[in-house]
A protein has these predicted regions:
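Low-complexity, glycine/alanine/valine/leucine- and proline-rich hydrophobic stretches
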Residues: 382-420, 429
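Cleavable N-terminal signal peptides
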Residues: 11, 21-22
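A long, amphipathic alpha-helix that forms part
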Residues: 38-39, 193-210, 214-217, 222-264, ...
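Short, structured active-site-proximal loop/turn typified by the sulfatase FGly-forming signature C/S-X-P-X-R
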Residues: 40-88, 130-132
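Bacterial N-terminal signal peptides that target proteins for export
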Residues: 1-9
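His/Asp/Glu-rich, glycine-adjacent segments
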Residues: 85-230
């Protein structure tokens, strides 16, 4: 069995502090879009999640995890793996902002090379631990993940995406070999509706065959259903119950490898219901900040020039083509203030300068527009300024002090105090906590580990 008591030096906030740690195998399960209340208030909400509820009595848990800015998946996933904020690790949104072509979506931060700070995979690999991953974001091309089925969707056509997954899985041939036993990998074919069960089946086989000492698994069902139907809708509650069963299977597989294994369940963000969209870019077009080509019926609207544009994340970062253009900056500021003056637009606050820097995100933004719960920023270039939906959908991306954006954290296993309520914690504490349990040094983490260990 892989476990021992070890004293390691952990670099935190620029200091080298000695910690006695429980060095043992760790399985981290990330449940996308899961508010903590799916577990902490399960009984009150009529939810049957016995496997997740066990963590509250058998281990330590947070009532809420304050996330990062913006509270969307890719920056949050990188912070969970590094203990650093987006402005340090470099993953600033789900999609990049591409100033040279504003007519197409920019690339997604799929690649390990996009993360500029030390990850738990890196730290575990340096310590010669066996690492593995199924679908946790940001692993494509990593040299630190020995057995990896990454999240990578380069094509809207799943057969092409599957070819890309087979080509980028590590080591070469891993996914093809596993499919020979387990059948076709449909872990990111969201038309199948059993994507999480498929990921779990492949993760359990990796656990059984290769006995990784640090493994990450990402599950999406709660996020998918909450986006479509709203958080805590019957559909998202059903997804949470299905994931609870998968968590039980994964935990059992980890404990079958080593009864002293530690299992952590995290989420990247919560979700909030929303019914209104503010089409901020239409206001930018009307103000002359974005110039459009003449419209042609049946063809997409095209931007031909821009001075300021919107980088959306439920709220928005406002990017200037020329950051030194003070006239445009002043014009944008005045426009945003005018929009905020109308309560119907749902603007919560406008940030700039040091206020943006303090969020730890939105690097390069001239302004950040945070919205009130229930209102999101849309991407339309023409049409009405506001649009209302007949039924709520689920959204995230608000600034992390919005309690509906709270993420979740549960942990249980050898050395973890049972029944310990950690209260409200910071997402940047999770990676150094798991590094402490693994007995590895995470180079760039800037927060102290959570007090999860038994005295």
């Amino acid at each position: 069995m892989f476990h021992k008591i070890a004293a390691v030096a952990v670099s935190l906030v620029g200091l080298m502090t000695a910690h006695t740690v429980m060095a043992g195998p760790v399985l981290m399960i990330s449940i996308d879009g899961m508010n903590p209340e799916y577990v902490t208030e399960a009984q009150a909400r009529g939810l049957k999640t016995p496997n997740l509820r066990r963590f509250m009595t058998e281990g330590a848990y947070a009532t809420g995890v304050r996330g990062v800015a913006p509270s969307v998946s890719w920056p949050s996933a990188a912070s969970l793996m590094t203990g650093t904020p987006p402005n340090r690790h470099g993953v600033l949104n789900n999609e990049r902002f591409e100033p040279t072509d504003r007519n197409r979506p920019a690339g997604i931060y799929y690649f390990a090379a996009d993360i500029r700070t030390d990850t738990l995979w890196d730290a575990a690999d340096r310590a010669n631990l066996v690492t593995a991953n199924v679908d946790q974001l940001g692993s494509v091309g990593s040299r630190s993940v020995r057995y990896d089925i990454p999240r990578y969707e380069p094509s809207a056509w799943y057969p092409e995406t599957l070819k890309a997954l087979e080509a980028t899985a590590s080591p070469p041939g891993l996914l093809t070999d596993l499919q020979g036993k387990l059948g076709r990998y449909t872990g990111i074919d969201f038309e199948t509706r059993d994507y999480d069960a498929v990921r779990t089946r492949f993760a359990i086989e990796i656990l059984r065959r290769y006995k990784p000492q640090f493994m990450t698994v990402h599950l999406s069902g709660v996020d998918v259903e909450a986006h479509e139907h709203g958080p805590f809708s019957p559909q998202s509650l059903k997804a949470a119950e299905a994931i609870d069963d998968l968590v039980g299977q994964l935990r059992a597989a980890a404990l079958a490898n080593d009864p002293d294994a530690v299992v952590a369940v995290v989420s990247d963000h919560g979700q909030a219901p929303a019914t209104r969209t503010l089409s901020l870019r239409t206001a930018f077009v009307q103000a002359g900040l974005i110039t459009l080509a003449p419209t042609t019926p049946g063809r997409p609207v095209q931007i031909v020039d821009w001075k300021a544009d919107v980088w959306r994340s439920t709220g928005a970062a406002i990017m200037l083509r020329d950051p030194a253009d003070t006239a445009t900056r002043d014009k944008v500021r005045a426009l945003l203030k005018a929009l905020a003056a109308d309560p119907a637009n749902g603007v919560s606050r406008i940030l700039e300068g040091a206020e943006i820097e303090a969020t730890g995100g939105f690097k390069g933004a001239a302004f950040v527009l945070d919205m009130k719960s229930g209102v999101t920023v849309g991407g339309d270039l023409i049409g009405d300024l506001r649009r209302d939906r007949p039924k709520p959908v689920g959204v995230h991306g608000y600034l992390p002090d919005n309690p509906q954006m709270n993420a979740a954290f549960f942990i249980a296993g050898r050395g973890v105090a049972a029944g310990r309520n950690l209260g409200q914690v910071d997402m940047l504490q999770i990676a150094p906590t798991l590094a402490q349990v693994l007995g590895v040094r995470l180079k760039d983490a800037q927060a102290r580990p959570l007090p999860i260990l038994q005295p």
